[in-house]
Amino acid sequence: MMGKIAYGLAGLLAFVVCLGVANGASQLEFPVWDRHYTGTIAGKAVNVGITRINGDLHGSYCYEPCNQRKMRLILSGSLQDKRLLLEERAQTLSGQWDAEISPSEIKGVWTSADKKRHFPIALRYNKPKGDPDIDLVLVAEVNDDYDPSKAIDCNNVPVISAIKLYRDGKLIQTLNTASIGTCSIFTPQWRDVNFDGYPDLSIPQELPAGPNIPEQTWLYDPSTQRYVDAPASYQEITSPEPDAEYKQIVSYWRGGCCSHGVDIYRWKGKEVELIDSGSSYRQPVLSKGKMYTCYVIPSYHDGRIFYLQKRKNGHLTPPFTDVEGCEPFELTTNIRTVIQPEKPGMEPESIEIKWQGNKSSPGEFCPLVPFVEGDKISPRLVTNKDIPDICISRNEFKAMSK
């Protein structure tokens, strides 16, 4: 993703880092990149991701076809000039890599943990479309919380104060920032966030309770060939994910232990606007005569927000039969049944709890709950016989209705 790595530049930076720290400098600099490779190990197709932070490397890979069920082997090691040395682990050490890396490929030898088997490694760098051919160097602050003589870990993480952009070994721009990871540093990412055909640059700022990760983003201005701050309306979005197909920005968020959702934004001129939002709710469910509430978070795909249930030929689909992870029903906030709208742009149907008089106990008002039962909605009046003290008096009902 970073284009051609200037090895001479990296060597010079390593010298500057050592010299600066030795002389008590308050900053150090190191190159970073994230790369995706495909190719073969022992003739078998693999998919590889590697991140470089100065001379340290980490990443993972899997044998094709990769999917969620396939285990990814964990990679860690170092880059010494053009020599790449990695250990791979699947819980325990499973192999070692010794290879040469160039701007376009990795070639070398894989050796088993017992050193009895040796196979060729042949990987090609999948250069992203529109790659800006810019090398990135991070400027890190050396202070009481970071000791550069020790490995970066949860107790030793530097604050990144700037990103330097180089092309062909020449500094073209410096972007000031304030980024600090929890147990490692964040690496910048190239993404076209405003869908103008030019890659923009982003870096996370910190790691709060996920997924609310704030990012700092710079947009590429082709008229000046410089990177400029994205507008505040974009910077305020946490964990933004550009959807290039629909030209939208998607943000999954968390408002607490029991509040999650997804927002959709779209560019309007030089600003972004919120165009849709979906939040979590508690779905009431009847299953085998028992009452439950199931926590549901809407999802995003195909350019729109999707809810769990939709109507088809008068029935709900998919039928709600799995109550694993659901809780026994109790009256809490945000209980409702939500039905997916038939067409994009339409509002979802939201069926709330209503309070209704209990004919079996005059003067008592109980919740009429829109339970989903299999493939249909089964409203049920939940009384004190079901759950003690769930109903309210007439006076309480009048006060609530005002």
Predicted regions and their residues:
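Bacterial N-terminal signal peptides that target proteins for export
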Residues: 1-10
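Acidic, small-residue rich beta-repeat scaffolds with periodic aromatic anchors
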Residues: 26-27, 31-33, 56, 82-157, ...
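Acidic/hydrophobic-patterned starts of short beta strands in beta-sheet-rich repeat architectures
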Residues: 193-205, 245-250, 351
